[in-house]
Amino acid sequence: MESKYLDLLAQKYDCEEKVVTEIINLKAILNLPKGTEHFVSDLHGEYQAFQHVLRNGSGRVKEKIRDIFSGVIYDREIDELAALVYYPEDKLKLIKHDFDAKEALNEWYKETIHRMIKLVSYCSSKYTRSKLRKALPAQFAYITEELLYKTEQAGNKEQYYSEIIDQIIELGQADKLITGLAYSVQRLVVDHLHVVGDIYDRGPQPDRIMEELINYHSVDIQWGNHDVLWIGAYSGSKVCLANIIRICARYDNLDIIEDVYGINLRPLLNLAEKYYDDNPAFRPKADENRPEDEIKQITKIHQAIAMIQFKLESPIIKRRPNFNMEERLLLEKIDYDKNEITLNGKTYQLENTCFATINPEQPDQLLEEEAEVIDKLLFSVQHSEKLGRHMNFMMKKGSLYLKYNGNLLIHGCIPVDENGNMETMMIEDKPYAGRELLDVFERFLREAFAHPEETDDLATDMAWYLWTGEYSSLFGKRAMTTFERYFIKEKETHKEKKNPYYYLREDEATCRNILAEFGLNPDHGHIINGHTPVKEIEGEDPIKANGKMIVIDGGFSKAYQSTTGIAGYTLLYNSYGMQLVAHKHFNSKAEVLSTGTDVLTVKRLVDKELERKKVKETNVGEELLQEVAILESLREYRYMK
């Protein structure tokens, strides 16, 4: 088998010189400094804030500009240059508007092109020429390389270089070149992006985030609980679909469903208009300018889909006793005559109820109309071209957890008991815990995605369990109290008891144990965790367990910023070590363009490498070493006999 493989490879490397050249090239790359990793999490559909963090590389762009130009140009010019790199098209329009004379603008173009070339050169210093070429604007790659590789002894060619820039300006190409170089800088300052979960949720533009990620040069995703809800819906889970629409109605984001993904909500609206009225508990958290009649429509839709959701949950709970969720059969615990519910031996009065479609004898039975509506919605979801593209990318680039360069990336938690031992869940009569449990969860999710025509098999039900189950690594609470929050006034019923992981992650021994469970070195590895906002306002530290645990909820969701005191955190990991970056609230692109100010506050060193980390010590390095070994085998097999 191996000889056949090597014979095939020899078609590409058909002489010894080609093999040797590639081995030399790969071994040289292994000794370059590792590229910068950028970690972001909990984007929650907030595209504008997310793409700003992406454009500035969590401060890497301005850091590079300061390295080169600090003390050479004024701080105001540094801010201007940074804004030009972040938003080249918009900034160019503003700058050109300030020039009256063409000669002055042309001088500005010359100076700016020189600065941008310097910046690209500095940002690409640890990359091969081949990798740099891929990052350059394609139409100007040759010209840019000529300007980049100008040497100190280039006196004979000085006029040649000047003429290149003069001609670029004269032929009206300066804007295109500057814009292309700006995007090259953005690409060069970050080698690889990790999105540690929750692209989707309450924010208005998750679709634009997905498009941005699809076009990004190097990215992976660790699924969040909201991401899995969307994957589950696309995979055939009607209850996941009902949850998505309910959340979109609650946060006045039904546009995502209808306008962005082309899913027809008219049948649901007709059902809602027939059975439901206005209800304060279901009014959306809407824009103040939204007309009252639209708010009432959304309120009715919100009730209709919530009741469908509650009804759809019951059959799953009944057919999956291993989910251990019998206490969530809430529709059966209601006294419909008295409008009361008994929970844990205590009776509560229900408020703002909307039980028009419930048969007290069989409370979880869908009306024929409700069943028809959810079937139509599922058909629309599974036939949305755009959603299909986004979900396929999510599955291709995503996983429940990732081991990368010695670190463990995970959105939610590793379910543990009070003593830090991995919790066990029985699935198909077999116990699973820790890494094995997450692996089986992911296997079922991929199986559900591969068979969207199945709507009530174990794999599809497991997608919903990942959203709401006690031992789900994405939920990590005893129960989700959605029903109680709508209908019961007493706040004690709203509490969701968290898995002990969330306080034990402060403990170094627990974190070391988790790293070891995933086959990572506890002395050098870290757990990089999203999902929970860091309440800095109350003194909470995102660096926990003596540096073994780093919590980086990006805080992009405006709703959480009042509880955290800041917008959130991102993480950078380059060849020198790890830096945690705190962000202020992002107001608008216009503010950045006009003032040049950034949303970053402070960077904190998490870990400093004693020696610069090289490519050979990374995941990419492992792959390159395998390639080298194969090429050496080919050389021996084919050319050294």
From Swiss-Prot:
Q: Which GO terms describe its molecular function?
A: fructose 1,6-bisphosphate 1-phosphatase activity
Q: How is its activity regulated?
A: Activated by phosphoenolpyruvate (PEP) and by high concentrations of monovalent cations, NH(4)(+) being most effective. Is inhibited by two types of compounds which apparently act on the enzyme at different sites. The first group consists of nucleoside monophosphates (most effective are AMP and dAMP), phosphorylated coenzymes, and denatured DNA and RNA, whose inhibition is competed by PEP. The second group, whose inhibition is not competed by PEP, consists of highly phosphorylated nucleotides (pppGpp and pppApp are most effective), nucleoside di- and triphosphates, and PPi.
Its cofactor is: Mn(2+)
Enumerate the SUPFAM superfamilies for this protein: Metallo-dependent phosphatases
What is its induction?
A: Constitutively expressed. Expressed at a fairly constant level in cells undergoing glycolysis or gluconeogenesis.
Q: Name one GO biological process term.
A: gluconeogenesis
Describe activity versus pH. Answer: Optimum pH is 8.
* EC supergroup of this enzyme: hydrolase
Read off the Gene3D superfamilies from this record.
Answer: 3.60.21.10
Q: What is its EC number?
A: 3.1.3.11
Please give the pathway this protein is involved in: Carbohydrate biosynthesis; gluconeogenesis
Xref: InterPro entries: FBPtase_class3, Metallo-depent_PP-like
Task: Show the HAMAP family listed in the entry.
Answer: FBPase_class3
Family the UniProt entry places it in: Belongs to the FBPase class 3 family.
Record-given protein name: Fructose-1,6-bisphosphatase class 3
What organism is listed for this UniProt entry?
Bacillus subtilis (strain 168)
